[in-house]
Amino acid sequence: MRPQLSDYQHVSSGKVRDIYEVDDNTLLMVVTDRISAYDFALEPAIPDKGRVLTATTMFFFDAIDFPNHLAGPIDDARIPEEVLGRAIIVKKLNMLPFECVARGYLTGSGLKEYNANGTVCGIELPEGLVEASRLPEPIFTPATKAEQGDHDENVSFERVVQDLGQERAEQLRDETLRIYSAAAKIAEEKGIILADTKFEFGLDSEGNLVLGDEVLTPDSSRYWPADTYAEGIVQPSFDKQYVRNWLTSEESGWDVESETQPPVLPDDIVAATRLRYIEAYERLSGKRFIDFIGG
């Protein structure tokens, strides 16, 4: 008999995840179907999104050689039936206060900063780069973790050193880039470009660095089809960039600089986003989403 979600104490909720305490050492992390963009929670939710993100994270936890926060299998008996397939049991960690971003291509906030001053997070880049340009080598571009409702802020590597010390900062940078490169190779073999991604790390009780949160999902990464890749244009994508693109289109009527709540997503955008997330998982993993637990 599985426990009920109400049997666990609710600890916190973010834009997408709800956290519950299982015991002194472990948490239940529930991935909802909520979606956010530009630091706003959007309406409506994307059906099956929580399961897709969980399935993708589980695939990469298995594929990537680095300690992670998993504390049980996807069908762990401690997971309530009502969230089976979109929840995992995880170890409690002391989470570090930075999002660790790896970029292999120039787009998004990185492109905006580059166009302004030729750098990304203080890293000087060659002249003449445009939307979707491949960088000479992947770069580490950390960001502060914003509270819900606030904006994440890109920061320099020196800021990470200042807060965490040289050794820990270098470890974060080196492991972020190593994991990104390994994942990019997996994606490349499946005809997909991993343009960028972000990781969150924490420390376990012995001070070891551990991967937490989600990894390499369509929420935390930009995935582009390799067969249509071209510099200088916004790429079609298997991630929530599709939602971002609609929000900044004339059709939505929303001004990203307005600081106002974005409009409700149309049904066709919701449906297309769901299919993109599922396609990303199926192409990357080689598995059918319909076969993943909880369906």
UniProtKB/Swiss-Prot annotation:
GO cellular component, as recorded: cytoplasm
Catalysed transformations (reactions): 5-amino-1-(5-phospho-D-ribosyl)imidazole-4-carboxylate + L-aspartate + ATP = (2S)-2-[5-amino-1-(5-phospho-beta-D-ribosyl)imidazole-4-carboxamido]succinate + ADP + phosphate + 2 H(+)
PROSITE patterns assigned to the protein according to its UniProt record, in alphabetical order: SAICAR_SYNTHETASE_1 (PS01057), SAICAR_SYNTHETASE_2 (PS01058)
GO function terms (MF aspect): ATP binding; phosphoribosylaminoimidazolesuccinocarboxamide synthase activity
Name of the gene this protein is made from: purC
Annotated keywords: ATP-binding, Ligase, Nucleotide-binding, Purine biosynthesis
Species this chain originates from: Corynebacterium ammoniagenes (Brevibacterium ammoniagenes)
Protein's UniProt name: Phosphoribosylaminoimidazole-succinocarboxamide synthase
Phylogenetic placement of the source organism: Bacteria, Bacillati, Actinomycetota, Actinomycetes, Mycobacteriales
Broad class of enzyme this protein falls into: ligase
Homology family: Belongs to the SAICAR synthetase family.
EC number: 6.3.2.6
HAMAP family given in the database record: SAICAR_synth (MF_00137)
Keyword Phosphoprotein carried by entry: no
Pathway: Purine metabolism; IMP biosynthesis via de novo pathway; 5-amino-1-(5-phospho-D-ribosyl)imidazole-4-carboxamide from 5-amino-1-(5-phospho-D-ribosyl)imidazole-4-carboxylate: step 1/2
